[in-house]
Amino acid sequence: MKKSIIAVIIIAVFGAVVLMQYSGTYNEAVNNQETVDQSWNDVSAAYQRRADLVPQLFETVKGAAKNEKEILTAVTQARAGIVNAQTPEDMQMFGKKINTAINLAFEAYPQIRSTERFADLQAQLEGTENRINKARTDYNATIKNYNTHIRGFFTKMILNNEEFPRKEGFKASQGAEKAPEIKF
């Protein structure tokens, strides 16, 4: 009788160990799968940030550049008049036009900063691309962790391959090695 109780206890303990191993392996696979999904969502969020931010940045820079172009055009036209002036009166008149153009321009646009805007644009673009690259790198790391787990010896025996398929990491699209053109 004692031998049968000991055998039942050993079988129960063995069954409990197997069940705990199975549940631990399964739960880790689920956790890794969710981490992969979250990581991909981070990549998508970085792409969405770029899609939302870049057009706004370009419009800001284009607006600043347009304002400065208007100022430069007015000053250049007035200055051309001075060069072509025949008399001192003409020279004085075009000088006043230059001063008026400059004063009006600076009153309308007290801080002419298109160069700073372009530098800000460049910094924002670089930061955005760095965020995307970091999200892709993190995604690939979570894929590696997930795939390593599901391909482990005991894990492979325990898990259903259809429920936990191998995942592919981020791969650049064809032509991605070429820098995109930016036109103003």
Language model segments and positions:
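A helix-centric hydrophobic-segment signal that preferentially recognizes long
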Residues: M1-F184
